Amino acid sequence: MSQISPLYYGIIPARYGSSRLPGKPLIDIWGKPMFWYVYQNAVESNIFRSVVLATDSEEIAESAHQLSIPYVMTSVEHISGTDRVYEAAIKMNIEPDSVVVNIQGDEPLVKPEAIQQLVEPFIDVSIQVTTLSTRITANQAMLPHQVKVVVSSNGDALYFSRAAIPYLRDNDTDGYYLGHIGLYAFRMHTLDKFVHLPPSQLEQFEKLEQLRLLENNIPIRVVNTNHTSQGVDTVEDLEIVQGLLAQRMEAVSR
C-alpha cells in the first residue's frame, strides 16, 4: 500500500432556497447563523489547508463576510450540494490528487473528530471516496429518511438504501444495522468524474446520489464512527439542535 498524505480542502455548500426552511443557513442559533457552527467545527478539525462556504446567495455571502468566513459564489442552478462543492473546488483550482470534503451546511453539530476520521483512509493513495456510518437500532432502520449502508469485509460500501438492509430473516431486533452519515470526501479527480456521470438508475429509484458511484464501479470506503450528528431539515430538527448546542455551550463554560 502506497502512503502519501494529501492536501485537504473543506467546502460547505450553503444554498438559500429550501422548501421547508427557506434561508436555512442563516437561521439564528444562539446569536450566530447556522453555517458559522459548521465552519468552526471544520476549522477545529485542524486538517484543512482551507475551509470555505459555497453559496448562491448574496445575503449568505454578506453574513459570511461579516464573520470573516471565506466564501465562493456559485450558481443558483445546482441540483445537489455536491455539484455546488464541485464548482467551488474548480474556482479554487484544487489539485487533482487533493481531497475535497463536502461538509453539509445544515449540520451544525458535526464533530471535528468525525471529520478527522472521514479523511484518515486517504493516506492510502488507492482510496478515492469516503463517507461515514454509525450503528443504529432496528427501529431507526425502519425509517426511510434514515439511509442504511452495508459494507464489504474491507470496509467498502456494497449498497445504500432507504429500506432496512440487511433483511434479518430471523427477526433479530438487535441486528447489525449501519446508518449512513452524509459527510463525504473525494479526491478531486474522482469528484470531477462523478459530477460528469449521468444520474444512474438506482440513484433515481432511491433518490441517493452516492449510488451513482457504486453503479459506475467507483468504490466508497465507509468509516464507522461514534461521533453522530443532527441535520436540520425541519423546525423540530432545529429545536433539537438548539437544545444540544445549549448543552455543549453550558459544558464548555463550566
From Swiss-Prot:
It is found in: Cytoplasm. CDD domains: CMP-KDO-Synthetase (cd02517). One of its GO terms (molecular function) is 3-deoxy-manno-octulosonate cytidylyltransferase activity. The keyword Cytoplasm applies. GO terms for biological process: CMP-keto-3-deoxy-D-manno-octulosonic acid biosynthetic process; lipopolysaccharide biosynthetic process. One of its GO terms (cellular component) is cytosol. PANTHER family: 3-DEOXY-MANNO-OCTULOSONATE CYTIDYLYLTRANSFERASE (PTHR42866), 3-DEOXY-MANNO-OCTULOSONATE CYTIDYLYLTRANSFERASE, MITOCHONDRIAL (PTHR42866:SF2). Belongs to the KdsB family. This is 3-deoxy-manno-octulosonate cytidylyltransferase.
